[in-house]
Amino acid sequence: MVKNNYPSRRQAKKQTNWFLIISSVLIAVLLVAAGLYSVFGVSRTVQQTNGSSVIKSSKQATDATRSKDTKGLPDVSPKDWELLLVNRDNESKELNPEIADVNGVSVDARIAKNVKEFLAAAQEIDPSYHLISGYRSVAYQTELYDSYVQQEMVADPSLTKSQAEKKVQTYSQPPGASEHQTGLAIDMSTVDSLNEADPDTVAKVKELAPKYGFVLRFPDGKTSSTGVGYEDWHFRYVGRGIAQYITAKGWTLEEFLDHLNDPV
């Protein structure tokens, strides 16, 4: 009898059953895997989409706020002479502006008329208002600054020169960092001492300053912006339109220039 190589019906049935079982298991595994991918894949996509939406919305909100904040920004350039910025972050060499005398104080000749009118207006509020300081050369600022440092060290012998300088810089700037060398800044008060004038009087003078192109340069609460504490006597010429805009916004010159350099 010739043997055939085909399995018997029982063997075939047995093999078929195992094949069906294995196939069913594989299909079930694939279906579960597909389901998990569908759930977590979609979730991840939604999270990524939502994350992008949040970032985009946040940026749009920031831009909208900034755009609103800079609405009506004057059409001027940071390079305009009225906006010259001199501070400890923007030191300058000797500028040698053309100067003019106003009541014994030197100022940039281009603002002499404004200084006279501003002083006269301040004197209508309080007749004791007078000019204390105006233009200073870098050489003179060096002498003044060094003398202040020496005074602090004499008053407190425990201070190092570095500590004395740090103390001095709360009321006077190092050579090259003083706004007085521009000729665009004036110190004007009813007294010859910093922050000792009547606050109500100072507030009135501060309010009328923009009419003559000036702003109170170092307002209270703005040290983080200017690097200088409150000074009730230091006014800076920036031009009438800009002075009115800055005052209305409650900005410092630094803040105005930041917006001017980086508009939306």
What are these regions (language model features)?
Residues V2-V264:
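Extracytoplasmic cell-surface/polysaccharide-interacting catalytic and binding patches
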